[in-house]
Amino acid sequence: MSQRTVTRRYAAALYEEANANGVLEAVDEDVRMLLESLDSNRPLVRVFESPVIPQDKKDSIVRELLGDRVEDLTVRFLRLLIRKDRETMTEAILDQYQTLRDEQRGIVDAEVTVARPLADETRTTLVGVLEEKTGKEIRLHLHEDADLIGGLVVRIGDRVFDASVRSQLGALHDRLREATLSENALDDGA
């Protein structure tokens, strides 16, 4: 079974249990906190990923660190990951959980690359256009890349819309090359 399939299954199981037990909002907050902790505390990640640290030690670390701070379901879920030897996938599973929750709420991430910073008004307009096109709430992530020259590239999920000057110049270059090759072929044939 692929890692992606495993992360989706565990994330969906956590969501379903949290929903069934009426603790969805609490688990959402736990997941946010855990992801922030894992991101800022690389030694903790190394503990989870270490094959030399026994499962019972990892289990007691989870209980000691999180026991009273998070929802009981969250602790039980993390302990399950340890028992099933899936603790190395914790971060990916929690990320997938957040993606699943965003889908449930109708929120999508839009990765937008621009040549230079956007004015606030332009950013607001862009979000409005993207929300209208997708029918979903947009969470905008802006990146700058001067190589684009101008325009922008938008990635939402697997879809990419490239309206950069760089790509337009590349397309123009390809058309000119084809026209030149066609013209040369005609000249050679005459």
UniProtKB/Swiss-Prot annotation:
Coiled coil: none annotated. Its main location: membrane. GO terms for cellular component: plasma membrane; proton-transporting ATP synthase complex. It holds the Pfam family OSCP. It is a peripheral membrane protein. It is found in: Cell inner membrane. Keywords: ATP synthesis, Cell inner membrane, Cell membrane, CF(1), Hydrogen ion transport, Ion transport, Membrane, Transport. GO terms for molecular function: proton-transporting ATP synthase activity, rotational mechanism. NCBIfam families: ATP_synt_delta (TIGR01145). F-type ATPases have 2 components, F(1) - the catalytic core - and F(0) - the membrane proton channel. F(1) has five subunits: alpha(3), beta(3), gamma(1), delta(1), epsilon(1). F(0) has three main subunits: a(1), b(2) and c(10-14). The alpha and beta chains form an alternating ring which encloses part of the gamma chain. F(1) is attached to F(0) by a central stalk formed by the gamma and epsilon chains, while a peripheral stalk is formed by the delta and b chains. Belongs to the ATPase delta chain family. F(1)F(0) ATP synthase produces ATP from ADP in the presence of a proton or sodium gradient. F-type ATPases consist of two structural domains, F(1) containing the extramembraneous catalytic core and F(0) containing the membrane proton channel, linked together by a central stalk and a peripheral stalk. During catalysis, ATP synthesis in the catalytic domain of F(1) is coupled via a rotary mechanism of the central stalk subunits to proton translocation. This is ATP synthase subunit delta. It comes from Salinibacter ruber (strain DSM 13855 / M31). The gene is atpH.
